[in-house]
Every structure is written in structure tokens, then in C-alpha cells.
Amino acid sequence: MTQFAFVFPGQGSQTVGMLADMAASYPIVEETFAEASAALGYDLWALTQQGPAEELNKTWQTQPALLTASVALYRVWQQHGGKAPAMMAGHSLGEYSALVCAGVIDFADAVRLVEMRGKFMQEAVPEGTGAMAAIIGLDDASIGKACEEAAEGQVVSPVNFNSPGQVVIAGHKEAVERAGAACKAAGAKRALPLPVSVPSHCALMKPAADKLAVELAKITFNAPTVPVVNNVDVKCETNGDAIRDALVRQLYNPVQWTKSVEYMAAQGVEHLYEVGPGKVLTGLTKRIVDTLTASALNEPSAMAAALEL
């Protein structure tokens, strides 16, 4: 059988009505959301199915919703005899989904933890003062240089290395605007402002990371049953303290997604299954390693087909 890995998406993959078809076919989806709702104290399934979108898109609600969606899909896979992947990795928030599915963190603990992570992130930067933008069609070094020159005493830096030619920058709103303009002047095809309220993975997140460290210390971490490639160092840690440390640093350091996918391919992985709503990571895969194939497990037909392999 082809060596495969599971990858778990981060924020941006949520939509109102996500996983409705999966829930109709697999009862464990709603059962998983019921567990999360009990941990949070509100009906998370109702929020994901009925919205409104502006509520679902609040980061402290987006994060538990996406984590739960990914865990629900993984449970469908397990329940129907799916084989264990060779490796796992998650993009930003998705790293928590991977750690739950690899048995490192208890699901209910993780749901509460990512809700707090969202609140800490929102508290760290007053709404309207931070921004993120996707830079399309410019090399990493030129983007880094544009950010350095545009900072002018503020914060702006590359924060998501999503694929060659697709890098997200984040920081103070004005600095992100200046850096976006500088990137276009340097030859970028586009600089697209992202509809987010929090500038994730930049230095402005350090206060949130300090609060997160306190909460992470309260949670039991087990050794992973499947290697999980982390975002910040592109390494598979097995020690609980090392995993905690990587999650703290992840909040104010770039997501090294390009390197993570390259690493998995170098370890012999040939196919990536995206375990979550949407197809963001599936779309990035070919741009990173053209010999890798990828598919999403977010529809009953796709799940059934993958389980038959």
C-alpha cells in the first residue's frame, strides 16, 4: 500500500454547514461534536450548522470547531478499519488536531485549550490594529526583505510558508499594508489582505504564547502513537515537554508548511489525506512536491473510497 500521511487544516477552512453530509452518513460525527459541546458549555454543532458565519469566524469559536471537525473525521476513519498513517502534521491550529489523533492530548482538554488559545490571541492585539496578507508569486527572501524595510518600528514578518510562491505575512495593520506594497513593487503578483482579526504567528502573539504556556503545563501529554511533524522546527518530538515548548513557540513563529511537506515526502510518504473541512492543504501539496498526491476526506464518497484502498 502507498505510504500516506494525514494532514489537518487550520483556520480558514471553516464554513457554516461543514460536515453535514458526513454527519448524515456517520453518526460518530455528531457524537464527537456533542463531546466538544459538553467540554465548552455551548452547542458547537448548532454553531457549525446554523451559524451565523460571523460567530463561527470568531477565533475562539473557529478553533474548537475545526479541531472537532478533524477529530470527528479521524474517528470515522478509525471506526471503519482505516490503517494508521505513517505520519501526521497540522497547519497551525491543525497541529492540535494531529496531536489529539496521535493520542498525545485528550480530546476534551484540547477543545478547551484551543478555545483559550483563540481568546489569548484576540486579547493580545486590539481588534483593527493587526492584519495578515497573502503574498503570491514572490520568493521567500524578497518577502523577508520587504517586511524588514516596511516595519519602520512596527511588527511585520512572514508567518506562513504555505508553498513556494505563497507566503502569508502578519503584524501591525499599517506595516502589513506597507510590506504588501513593497512586495508588489518587488514583483509579487498579488498581495491579498486576509479577512482575519488576529495577526497569527508574529511577534505580537508573544503575550498570548506566555498565557498559553501556563495552560499547557496543566495538561497531560502522552507519547504520540504516530509521528507528528511540528510547524515550528519541522521535527517529530516524543517528549511531552518538547511538544509543549513547540506549541508555545508556534504561536509567535512562522508555520513551516512547505518544509513539513518536503520532510514527509523525504521520509517516504507518497500521498496526503486532508482530514478536515475544505481542501486548502490538498491544493498546496502539488505546488510543494510535485510527486506527492493528495485528497480530502471531507465527503462520504471520498472517505468510503479511501477506506477501500
UniProtKB/Swiss-Prot annotation:
The active site is at 92, 201. SMART domains: PKS_AT (SM00827). One of its GO terms (biological process) is fatty acid biosynthetic process. One of its GO terms (molecular function) is [acyl-carrier-protein] S-malonyltransferase activity. It is an enzyme of class 2 (transferase). Its EC number is 2.3.1.39. One of its GO terms (cellular component) is cytosol. Pfam families: Acyl_transf_1. It comes from the Bacteria. Keywords: Acyltransferase, Fatty acid biosynthesis, Fatty acid metabolism, Lipid biosynthesis, Lipid metabolism, Transferase. It catalyses: holo-[ACP] + malonyl-CoA = malonyl-[ACP] + CoA. Coiled coil: none annotated. Pathway: Lipid metabolism; fatty acid biosynthesis. Belongs to the FabD family. NCBIfam families: fabD. PANTHER family: MALONYL-COA-ACYL CARRIER PROTEIN TRANSACYLASE, MITOCHONDRIAL. This is Malonyl CoA-acyl carrier protein transacylase.
